A protein has these predicted regions:
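N-terminal intrinsically disordered, cationic/polar leader segments
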Residues: 1-44, 58-66, 70-91
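Short, charge-rich amphipathic interface segments used for partner binding and complex assembly
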Residues: 43-55
Length: 91
């Protein structure tokens, strides 16, 4: 019985989906939170999208857009939290 190897398309889709999942984990799970790593995963997934088969692009794009919104929310909240930090000379 011979084992069938995955196609390049299968691996591209799997890799893009894994990167989107990793970005989500890096943004939502407290013990793994790392917005910089999430951004890197988002950018890598976006780079793979043009190489993925057309039928797989829409679901990955949808998940990616949700993760990108989480990233914007997370980084915006961090920026607001930093702006509330008292510094000498500020009221």
């Amino acid at each position: 019985m011979s084992e069938q190897l995955p196609t390049v398309s299968d691996l591209l889709v799997s890799s893009a989906a894994s990167l989107v999942n990793l970005a989500g984990i890096r943004l939502t799970e407290q013990e793994h939170k790392d917005p910089a790593a999430a951004k890197e995963a988002i950018e890598a997934a976006r780079a793979l999208l043009p190489l993925c088969p057309e039928e797989a692009v829409a679901p990955i794009k949808e998940a990616l857009s949700q993760v990108q919104m989480l990233y914007v929310k997370e980084t915006d909240e961090r920026a607001k939290a930093r702006s509330k930090i008292w510094t000498p000379g500020s009221p």
